[in-house]
Curated annotation (Swiss-Prot):
Native species: Drosophila melanogaster
Subunit and interaction comment: Interacts with Orco. Complexes exist early in the endomembrane system in olfactory sensory neurons (OSNs), coupling these complexes to the conserved ciliary trafficking pathway.
Transcription regulation among keywords: no
UniProt GO cellular component terms: dendrite membrane; plasma membrane
Lineage per the UniProt record: Eukaryota, Metazoa, Ecdysozoa, Arthropoda, Hexapoda
Highest taxon of the lineage: Eukaryota
Compartments, record wording: Cell membrane
Name of the gene this protein is made from: Or85e
Designated name of the protein: Putative odorant receptor 85e
Keyword Signal: no
Membrane-spanning segments: 61-81, 99-119, 160-180, 213-233, 287-307, 335-355, 368-388
Distribution of this protein across tissues and organs: Expressed in 15% of the 120 sensory neurons within the maxillary palp.
Keywords: Cell membrane, Membrane, Olfaction, Receptor, Sensory transduction, Transducer, Transmembrane, Transmembrane helix
Length: 467
């Protein structure tokens, strides 16, 4: 947590503006924690306080059983589609092969994602709790401020939209036989028994529909978690930028500067739209502080100590961001490696099936949904990684925007160390092999279309041999 001086020596819960600076959120990840429980990646959840003591064992066993059921559903469908792929390989029917292979990749990755986040659930929970405890909900007390609530709101809205999009794509495929009124399964795979029989059809259909829902939940959870953490960290970078810009204003505010003098400084820092420097912040918007609210309870310490202490608070915030960024890399590096491979092959196969497959309307719609979700998912990971890399080295630029030279003799050694550390770029990698940025986006798409060209040549040769 930040010191009381960070908030103007008034109150840690003070709001710099009643309407533009919302109260601090106690839990930034409430929605994601619910999703984590729903998609079976939280085998050991904390039981609520109202949970009866006599049912404590049931509360511990049920999540583990549910996680096991989700993993078994995904992996057994992956095995069945593997058998289907092996059965259609001798036929040489590329469309049938790519169909089965696509679903094999999807279900094995769903199983991998579920197992991965189950194993990382404790570490992920500790990470979320650390961010909830240490994040700054607004910038250093000064004449202007930014509120990180906007980043939280963006991440929450994105999570809702992305999860709904993923579920819509997979459920529409899963319920298509019901919509058409035909007795068939949504997933055409091998079974060692008659899956359409009167005693098994309902159970098999329910299992496949549940598996489809888990595909959407697993894909949606991984992407929304990464984007949420990225947006929150970018919001913290914006809080740091505004805090560094207001170091001199913060010192004057605590030093007893008159409201008129602070208002003049506010106009100087918060220029109009025509004169304001563009792209100072990634996500957040800068607002004028309600100076009367902050001036009412301020103290008047030595200005040199106030400036130095404020810089120390900014350094602590910067270290917190770098620590969280490193933990983000540790959590997602293995996941992004497998995700990159999965997206590469899946993108290639989906495009090939879309180009060379049958022209059934429902099939085309489902393929376009999967293709759109796959491309957008790749864009999410690479674009957020690019934003983190680019904006993690802009802290020094934000420092130069304030009147730092007036207090340079108080911070000689500290500022040199800070400026050196401010050039440490944040990178999210795929297994330490590739950086997840726009270059990776281009390379994945290039690789996918290279495989697509190879498949099209194989299909053309097969057609020529048949003629």
């Amino acid at each position: 947590m930040a010191s009381l001086q960070f908030h103007g020596n008034v109150d840690a819960d003070i709001r710099y503006d009643i309407s533009l600076d919302p109260a601090r959120e106690s839990n930034l990840f409430r929605l994601l924690m619910g999703l984590q429980l729903a998609n079976g990646t939280k085998p050991s959840p904390r039981l609520p306080k109202w949970w009866p003591k006599r049912l404590e064992m049931i509360g511990k066993v049920l999540p583990k059983a549910y996680c096991s059921m989700v993993i078994f559903t995904s992996l057994h469908l992956g095995v069945l589609f593997t058998k289907t792929t092996l059965d259609v390989l001798p036929t040489g029917e590329l469309q049938a092969i790519t169909d089965a292979l696509t679903m094999t990749i999807i279900y094995f990755f769903t199983g991998y994602g579920t197992i991965y986040w189950c194993l990382r659930s404790r570490r992920l929970l500790a990470y979320m709790e650390h961010m909830n405890r240490e994040y700054r909900h607004h910038s250093l007390a000064g004449v202007t401020f930014v509120s990180s609530h906007a980043a939280f709101r963006m991440s929450r809205n994105f999570t809702v939209v992305w999860i709904m999009s993923c579920l819509l794509g997979v459920i529409s495929w899963g319920v298509s036989p019901l919509m058409l009124g035909i007795r068939m399964l949504p997933l055409q795979c091998w079974y060692p028994f008659d899956a359409l029989g009167p005693g098994t059809y309902t159970a098999v259909y329910a299992t496949q529909l549940f598996g489809q829902i888990m595909v959407g939940m697993t894909f949606g959870f991984g992407g929304s978690l990464f984007v949420t953490l990225s947006l929150l960290l970018l919001g913290q970078f914006d809080v740091l930028y505004c805090s560094l810009k207001n170091l001199d204003a913060h010192t004057k505010l605590l030093g007893g500067e008159s409201v008129n003098g602070l208002s003049s400084l506010q106009e100087e820092l918060l220029l109009g739209d025509s004169k304001r420097e563009l792209n100072q912040y990634v996500l957040l918007q800068e607002h004028p502080t309600d100076l009367l609210r902050l001036s009412a309870g301020r103290k008047c310490p030595d200005q040199g100590n106030a400036f130095h202490n404020a810089l120390v608070e900014c350094i602590r915030l910067h270290r917190f961001i770098l620590h969280c960024s490193q933990e983000l890399e540790n959590l997602f590096s293995p996941y992004c490696l497998v995700k990159s491979l999965q997206i590469t092959f899946q993108l290639c196969l989906l495009v090939f099936v879309g180009v060379s497959g049958t022209r059934e309307v429902l099939r085309i719609v489902n393929q376009l949904q999967y293709l759109g979700l796959t491309i957008f998912e790749l864009l999410m990971f690479t674009y957020c990684g690019e934003l983190l890399s680019r904006h993690s080295i802009r802290s020094g630029d934000a420092f130069w925007r304030g009147a730092w030279w007036k207090h340079a003799h108080f911070i000689r050694q500290d500022i040199l160390i800070f400026l050196v550390n401010s050039r440490r770029a944040v990178h999210v990698t795929a297994g330490k092999f590739y950086v997840m940025d726009v270059n990776r986006l281009r390379s994945v798409i290039t690789q996918a279309f290279s495989f697509l060209t190879l498949l099209q040549k194989l299909a053309a040769k097969k057609t020529e041999s048949e003629l």
